Amino acid sequence: MNTEATHDQNEALTTGVRLRNAREQLGLSQQAVAERLCLKVSTVRDIEEDKAPADLASTFLRGYIRSYARLVHIPEEELLPGLEKQAPLRAAKVAPMQSFSLGKRRKKRDGWLMTFTWLVLFVVIGLSGAWWWQDHKAQQEEITTMADQSSAELNANGTNSQSIPLENSTTTVPEATPAPAAPVDTTANEQTPAASTPAPVTEPQQNAVVPPSQANVDTATTAPAAPATTTTPDTATPLPTDQAGVTTPAADPNALVMNFTADCWLEVTDATGKKLFSGMQRKDGNLNLTGQAPYKLKIGAPAAVQIQYQGKPVDLSRFIRTNQVARLTLNAEQSPAQ
């Protein structure tokens, strides 16, 4: 009767209560049980309170309970009915397998998307390259056109400058011929032959004076010796006065100074529309131009030229960065505007 009563009493107790009573009879604490079973104290507490943690699989929970029972010397057969209630076996949720055709369809769709993306990228790159090439080609054609125009203007100016000396020579020849206008002086030459001796004295003066003075020299040679001495200082006096009248022009405050580090095409126009320079300037060349401000400049290679206006450098960095033909205007206050 006593054994049957104790058996019925044990069945009435839950698994957790039986394990806790057995632990207390052995004088073990929850910390000691957790260290021996290599479990957390919270897990031992949940087992004794008949709790099944949601994050713990039932298979692991049943294994922990069996290890706990062996530790406190409780037969596993006595705990099996309680285990079925406390930690029932739960069927694992198996995710439905995706068909191979679905994955293949998705992969095919991703492949089309990547192909379209690469196609758009190539089109954008191609359009950008074509735009850059057209812009670069247009700049090169513009530079070539300006260079051809400047060469044509230089050739035209060269032909005009060559024709001018020929016209001057033809006009000056008749001016030198009126020398026979002194037939009256021949009688003086016959009467005073000694008057021809001062001629060597007047020869250096003939080299330094203009052709109209030659007539004065001829008349001086035909005069007597005494007047000849008085005319020599008169003919010599214009020389120092002409030299003193020649003065070097003062430096123009609006002068435009340019130094070239490479070959560069250039065109400079002043306020009156006069082209001060138009053509190709070579490396290590220098230009010093003066005119009426403001100046309009066209520079084919801005990186190859250094400009000083009113003693201050002109900033061309914005044209150098974009690598394009520089078009700017230099005002009297040195404010370059595109």
UniProtKB/Swiss-Prot annotation:
Record topological domains on the Periplasmic side: 133-338
CDD domains: HTH_XRE (cd00093)
Record's GO cellular component terms: plasma membrane
SUPFAM superfamilies on file: lambda repressor-like DNA-binding domains (SSF47413)
DNA-binding region: 30-49
Membrane topology reported for the UniProt record: Single-pass type II membrane protein
UniProt region (Disordered), positions on chain: 155-240
Membrane-spanning ranges: 112-132
GO molecular function: DNA binding
Compartments in which it is found: Cell inner membrane
Regions of compositional bias (Polar residues) in chain numbering: 155-169, 203-217
Keyword ATP-binding in annotation: no
Topology Cytoplasmic: residue spans: 1-111
SMART domains, sorted: HTH_XRE (SM00530)
GO biological process, one term: regulation of cell shape
Keyword vocabulary terms for this entry: Cell inner membrane, Cell membrane, Cell shape, DNA-binding, Membrane, Signal-anchor, Transmembrane, Transmembrane helix
Ranges of biased composition (kind: Low complexity): 170-188, 218-240
HTH cro/C1-type domain sequence ranges: 19-71
UniProt domain comment: The helix-turn-helix (HTH) motif in the cytoplasmic domain of the N-terminus is involved in the formation of spirals to maintain the rigid rod shape. As this protein is anchored in the cytoplasmic membrane, the HTH motif may contribute to protein-protein interactions to form the RodZ helix, which is localized beneath the cytoplasmic membrane. The C-terminal domain may be critical for determination of the rod shape by probably interacting with enzymes required for synthesis of the peptidoglycan layer, including PBPs in the periplasm.
HAMAP family, alphabetized: RodZ (MF_02017)
Free-text function comment from the UniProt entry: Cytoskeletal protein that is involved in cell-shape control through regulation of the length of the long axis.
Protein name: Cytoskeleton protein RodZ
Organism annotation: Escherichia fergusonii (strain ATCC 35469 / DSM 13698 / CCUG 18766 / IAM 14443 / JCM 21226 / LMG 7866 / NBRC 102419 / NCTC 12128 / CDC 0568-73)
GN (gene name): rodZ
